[in-house]
């Protein structure tokens, strides 16, 4: 067995620049910037998925996710994203279709977040703590057509009812046990059976994750305009009334990612832990 040495990763360069006096008079907040941040950095405008795709190409064998002990490499997740993207297209998802995520932090969230954006669809995040009334209100407000959720009693029954109460058209179910490592994937159904929902597999509006991704992963390319196309709709906390959907373009979200990378992430590329 030949063990390959991991690729050498160049440390992030931090060029210290100091804004001129005239600049700080016009933009006084520049004085508060950390010295390591290049205040005049040009932020690239790209589709959000491009950031992931570049990382997957550069670090295919590095671990991207560690979910309760089950590890996924960038290559693993990239394959799932590609297949999920084509699967979404096969059920009618296209550019600007609203794809809702009613999920906790889990691998399925990452897969569908990027799969939907890759084909130009718009993600709508739903808190898994929402009551049925809140779910229905947000589905109607966002015009969500497809919902992704887990096969848990706390989540799935709420969403299945929405097929009759709202304009929701499809549900994609990601079984939790399929995302767990051995032996948790065996023990969970045995000891937590009451927490697992009965899925309406005979209903054509309900699709299982493994069936959706049973394809070659070659989705039809979709042209995305970073400044114009909405990547996701993120709802506010609703402290002053009902939550309001904030429409975030690909350009705005990628800008935020690059800014966070410059200002907060001090590790070398691919070494960060979140």
Show where each model-derived region lies.
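Flexible, non-catalytic linker and terminal segments flanking ANL/adenylate-forming cores
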Residues: 1-45
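Structural core segment of the AMP-binding/adenylate-forming
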Residues: 1-5, 9, 14-18, 118-211
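Conserved AMP-binding/adenylate-forming core of the ANL superfamily
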Residues: 43-44, 53, 63-106, 110-114, ...
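Conserved AMP-binding A3 loop
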Residues: 73-75, 223, 231-258
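Conserved S/T- and glycine-rich ATP-binding loop of Class I adenylate-forming
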Residues: 77, 99, 116, 147, ...
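Conserved structural elements of the adenylate-forming
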Residues: 80-83, 213-216, 246-268, 274
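Short hydrophobic alpha-helical segments of the AMP-binding
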Residues: 109-117, 123, 253, 260
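Conserved pre-ATP/AMP-binding loop-to-beta segment of ANL
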Residues: 197-235, 242, 266-274
